[in-house]
């Protein structure tokens, strides 16, 4: 959590660090947080939307689900990556879930109450320290940014990737998407590299 009237931006994790974190959390029997981090980096949804996910959505036979985004009220269809599907099923089995309509990220504090965003941010900061993650500002937003950065870096056509991400993130321009992913700052800093002495 940031101080009132201050501005702190979250950073993205390197993809290998993010997927390794998901595996380590699972290995350490922290199944729900492993699943939460995994869903964040594989779906690119805002945390408010991740917290709406039910087991029925994640275990869908056609490996996709539709969600109405809380912030924009827009419907978004999400396809579940084949490799990530196995992790979802493993978490489902390990947690011994009995009700498919149950939210995936129940806090245990009251019936049908999901984790709070503040609590998740505290947990992420603890994970940063515990697993020695190389990231300055680690928050729920970092998961979405990690997704975006991976999509951008994996694409052979950077401009097309930015247009796709702009639509997925519901940004009004590619410029906003570039700034969101920290690409604009990198471009500006790279300006200094073109100088010679």
What is each of the regions a protein language model found here?
Residues 1-19, 73-82, 98-101:
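DNA breakage-rejoining catalytic core of tyrosine-based enzymes
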Residues 2, 15-43, 157-158:
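Basic, Lys/Arg- and aromatic-enriched nucleic-acid-binding interface segment
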Residues 15-18, 83-134:
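Active-site/catalytic core of tyrosine-dependent DNA strand-transfer enzymes
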Residues 52-84:
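Conserved tyrosine-mediated DNA breakage-rejoining catalytic core shared by Y-recombinases
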Residues 69-73, 169-194:
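Catalytic-site neighborhood detector that most strongly recognizes the C-terminal catalytic loop/helix
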Residues 146, 193-197:
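Short, basic, alpha-helical segments at the C-terminal edge of helix-turn-helix-like DNA-binding modules
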């Amino acid at each position: 959590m940031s101080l009132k009237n201050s501005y702190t931006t979250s950073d993205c994790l390197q993809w290998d660090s993010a997927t390794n974190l998901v595996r380590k959390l699972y290995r350490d029997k922290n199944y729900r947080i492993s699943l939460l981090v995994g869903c964040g980096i594989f779906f690119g949804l805002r945390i408010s939307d991740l917290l709406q996910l039910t087991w029925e959505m994640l275990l869908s036979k056609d490996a996709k689900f539709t969600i109405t985004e809380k912030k924009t009220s827009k419907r978004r269809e999400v396809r579940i990556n084949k490799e990530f599907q196995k992790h979802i099923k493993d978490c489902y089995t390990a947690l011994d879930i009995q009700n498919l309509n149950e939210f995936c990220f129940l806090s245990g504090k009251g019936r049908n109450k999901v984790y709070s965003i503040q609590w998740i941010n505290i947990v992420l900061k603890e994970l940063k320290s515990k697993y020695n993650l190389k990231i300055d500002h680690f928050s729920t937003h970092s998961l979405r940014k990690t997704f975006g950065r991976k999509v951008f870096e994996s694409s052979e056509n950077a401009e097309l990737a930015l247009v796709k991400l702009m639509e997925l993130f519901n940004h009004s321009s590619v410029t906003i998407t570039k700034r969101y992913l920290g690409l604009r700052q990198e471009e500006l800093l790279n300006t200094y590299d073109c100088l010679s002495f």
